[in-house]
Amino acid sequence: MNNIKVFVLMAGLTGLVVAIGQALGGGQGAILALLLSAGMNLFMYWGSSSMVLRSYGAQVVTAQDAPELYEMVDRLRQRAGLPMPTVAIAPQDQPNAFATGRNPENSVVCVTQGIMRALSKDELEGVIAHELAHIKNRDMLLQTIAATMAGAVSNLAQFAFFFGGRSDDDDGVHPVAGIAMLIIGPIVAMVIQFAISRQREFKADAVGAEISGRPLSLANALLKLESGARRIPMQVSPSAATLAIVNPLAAFSMRGISKWMSTHPPTAERVAALQALAA
């Protein structure tokens, strides 16, 4: 099912890019945009995880670099029946974590330095199990491509605003329609991305609790992580932020923002679901 969603996302990205190209350059713009989208789709499949790691400033570590973390990931991935993922650490004070990669054989589990200081061993195990659940559920490619897609469409729209569109004399999309498309395109991409992220987090919480055997430890971790994210800002692209276990941009979020524009489901709802599992 996730493979179908990945195909739909890539097709949607292609359609958005071609539509923007048509708005900016007519038929020639559409052709160039089609070629560009083909390159973007190939990059998203093969290289999006590297881009996400760079966005967080993360570095891959070995068992010699971080023995306790490496052993924890190894033990939990065996319990989940997964191959050993690459382990990475992001030099961020905010406590957070995420998983990325195109499949279980090419996956990465990344934690921040802040999370290793903020959580107990049981709580950190709960978080690692949550990220391994994303890998087990094959969420990473879908979420990583959604993140990259939203960022790519937003960047293309910014480029279009800087360099301008077509004149009234040219054939094709009217300038007003083109401007509307440039505004709506990134919003649509972000809403799709947010919806995917929220949907997959609940399932990863449940599967992660099953892997670790400690749903309450994950619930406690989520409360600590949300508190930390609100107190400690993190500089990361909004598109990559959806991959994290809690919203790393919570410190910048506007109060009263509607649920459908939130990158993550409400932590209180996630905690309640985990408490129900433990009951």
Curated annotation (Swiss-Prot):
The active site is at 131. Its cofactor is Zn(2+). It is a multi-pass membrane protein. The keyword Acetylation does not apply. The chain crosses the membrane at residues 6-26, 29-49, 145-165, 176-196. Binds 1 zinc ion per subunit. Keywords: Cell inner membrane, Cell membrane, Hydrolase, Membrane, Metal-binding, Metalloprotease, Protease, Transmembrane, Transmembrane helix, Zinc. The keyword Transcription regulation does not apply. Its EC number is 3.4.24.-. It is found in: Cell inner membrane. It holds the Pfam family Peptidase_M48. Zn(2+) binds at residues 130, 134, 201. InterPro entries: HtpX_protease, Pept_M48_protease_HtpX, Peptidase_M48. One of its GO terms (biological process) is proteolysis. This is Protease HtpX homolog. It comes from Gemmatimonas aurantiaca (strain DSM 14586 / JCM 11422 / NBRC 100505 / T-27).
